[in-house]
Design a protein with these regions (language model features):
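Walker B catalytic acidic pair
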Residues: 67
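Active-site-proximal or metal-binding-adjacent scaffold patches in catalytic folds
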Residues: 1-62, 71-82
Length: 82
């Protein structure tokens, strides 16, 4: 997928979940072993650039939403049930 399209999608989803208001941002990183990351201390959600370039829209959106869920519940939750 085009990185500019992924950026627009991520920005839209962050805005939709009111994370932009809280200072959260989206960017790409160079990760090789994971798709996405939620960094609470930086208020930043990232996707691996290589992942974003090769995956389809549905998978990318799902990954961004997964990281947004982490941002919304906070650092103490990890992958447990809320």
């Amino acid at each position: 997928m085009e990185l500019s399209s992924v950026q627009l999608l991520a920005d839209h989803l962050l805005n939709e979940h009111e994370l932009f208001k809280k200072g959260w941002r989206f960017s790409f990183d160079r990760a090789k072993r994971r798709a996405g990351c939620c960094r609470y201390s930086k208020k930043e959600i990232t996707l691996a650039k290589a992942y974003a370039e090769q995956e389809e829209l549905k998978e990318i959106k799902n990954t961004i939403l997964h990281e947004i869920a982490h941002a919304l519940v906070g650092p103490k939750h990890g992958h447990n049930v809320i």
